[in-house]
């Protein structure tokens, strides 16, 4: 099990974004190991607890009810252009959905927002990978020189080793740093 927090992208063929990159190695490993169904549970509003989210939805509902009443009152007055502006700020279908939510439905909506489940069926493969897992095990390498412990004179660097870091340039830095060490050591510098 793994978790991360950050911006999530819903795409035409799945989910993406930094949190997906961060936890995908575990999901792909579970898929590769045939561990059965792999699920991701998405929390679209992690800054709220479930109770606070229900209260927030109820507040939005009340605000939209009031906005709807205000728009109707303005429409009956002499300011149709202002009514059009206010009505355009709140999508009518969304406003009607929130207004019609009963208490139980509000709790169900909050539950879906906090615990949205997605079944992971595959990754996009090596072609689309940001980082690769696997490679030469570190216990087979002298990490001070990047030389193989099994084959003298063979040096490794970057993703050929079983090292992958979190997003943010760490994998690139690992490739550069380990490459500098391996290159210098292979030349006897």
Name each model feature, range by range.
Residues 1-106:
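An anion/pyrophosphate-binding glycine-rich loop and adjacent beta-alpha core
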Residues 88-164:
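A glycine-rich dinucleotide-binding beta-alpha-beta segment and adjacent secondary-structure elements
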Residues 37-39, 68-72, 140, 149, ...:
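Short, surface-exposed, polar/charged, turn-prone segments marking secondary-structure boundaries
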Residues 16-19, 136-137, 160, 167-171:
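Gly/Ser/Thr-rich beta-alpha loop segments that engage phosphate groups in nucleotides
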Residues 163-189:
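A conserved FAD-binding loop/helix module that cradles the flavin
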Residues 23-26, 143-144, 178, 188:
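N-terminal low-complexity, intrinsically disordered patches enriched in charged
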Residues 20, 110, 114, 176-184:
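Predominant activation on well-ordered alpha-helical scaffold segments within soluble catalytic domains
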């Amino acid at each position: 099990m793994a978790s991360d927090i950050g911006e999530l992208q819903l795409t035409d063929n799945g989910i993406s974004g930094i949190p997906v990159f961060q936890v995908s190695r575990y999901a792909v490993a579970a898929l590769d190991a045939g561990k059965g169904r792999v699920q991701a549970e998405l929390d679209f509003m992690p800054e709220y607890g479930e109770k606070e989210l229900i209260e927030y939805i109820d507040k939005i509902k009340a605000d939209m009810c009031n906005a709807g009443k205000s728009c109707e009152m303005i429409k009956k007055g002499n300011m149709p252009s202002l009514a059009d502006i206010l009505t355009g700020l709140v999508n009518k279908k969304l406003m009607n959905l929130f207004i019609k939510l009963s208490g139980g439905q509000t709790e169900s909506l909050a539950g879906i927002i906090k615990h949205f489940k997605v079944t992971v069926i595959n990754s996009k493969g090596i072609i689309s990978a940001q980082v690769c897992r696997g490679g030469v095990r570190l216990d087979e390498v002298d990490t001070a020189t990047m030389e193989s412990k099994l084959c003298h004179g063979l040096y490794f660097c970057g993703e050929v080793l079983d090292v992958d870091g979190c997003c943010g340039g760490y994998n690139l830095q690992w490739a550069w740093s380990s490459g500098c060490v391996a290159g210098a050591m292979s030349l006897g510098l």
